[in-house]
Amino acid sequence: MRVPSLTLAVACAALLAPAAARHHIAEEPVARREGAVGAADLLAKVRGCAQISRGRYRSDEGAPAAVPVCATRDAVFWKADLDIDCDGRPGPRCNRRTDPLFSAATAFQQSDGRDLSAESLPYIVVPAVSRIWDHGVRGGSVAAVVYRNRVQYAVVGDLGPRGIIGEASYATARGLGINPDPRGGGAASGVTYIVFKDSQVKPIEDHAAAVATGQRLARLFVRGKWPGVRPPTSRRPPAAPRR
C-alpha cells in the first residue's frame, strides 16, 4: 500500500519497484496460466460473497472502505486492486535507492532466517489482525491470485495496515503481467485473491512447492472436493439384532 510502514512486524507499505524495471518487464516470465485450472474456473467459484469480515477494507489510504473479505467452505477471498510490495531482502529492483518507502523487513522469514525477497518470490500481503478480520492466516498459506486470464500462485508473505487490503510482491505483479513499478504500475482493480484454508508451504520461499500445492488445491476447489470433507453418513439407528 502506498502508505508508510507501521512497524517492522507489521511492515506493509505499498512498495515500489524501480522505474528502470519498466524496460525489463517484457523479458520476465509471465504466468498466463500457472497450472491446469484457468482463471475463469476459479472466478466462477467466487462470484458471490458470504462476508466473514466485520467491516470492509480500504484499497488505499483515503479511499472508501468498500472491500469485504468473503469465504467459502474451502477458502477466503477478496477482490481489490494490487499495490506493489517491494519490502524484504534488497535486490537490484527493490532497495532504498529505488523505493523511498523501502523496508528491509517482512513479517515472515525464510527458513534461513533472512527476510523474503519481493522481487523474486511471489507472495501476497494480508492486513494485520484487527476487529475487522481476525483471520488467523499463517505465513506460507497458499494463495491463487487472478487477474484477467492469468493465475499466479503465491504464499502469504507479509502483513499490511489493519484497514487496507490489496497488495502483493513485485514478483507476483510481474507474473500476472502487471507493471511492478508502483510509480506507474500496479492494478487499479480487477484482482482476486483466493487463500486456501489450512494450507501452508514450508519452507515459505519454495515457490515450486507453492505452485504444486496451489494447483492441487485449485483443482479440488473448483471440483468441490476439498480434502478432509467427509461424505454424509446415515444417522439411522442400528438395526435390532435378530433373535
PLM region spans:
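Bacterial Sec-dependent signal peptides at the C-terminal "C-region" and cleavage site
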Residues: 3-4, 8-28
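Cell wall/extracellular polymer interaction/catalysis modules
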Residues: 22-150, 163, 175-183, 197-233
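Soluble periplasmic/extracytoplasmic beta-strand elements of cell-envelope proteins
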Residues: 123-125, 155, 192-194
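Short beta-strand-centered aromatic/proline hotspots
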Residues: 152-161
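Short, solvent-exposed secondary-structure boundary/capping segments
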Residues: 162-172
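Intrinsically disordered, low-complexity linker and terminal regions at domain boundaries
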Residues: 184-192
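Compositionally biased, proline/threonine/alanine/serine-rich low-complexity intrinsically disordered stretches
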Residues: 233-243
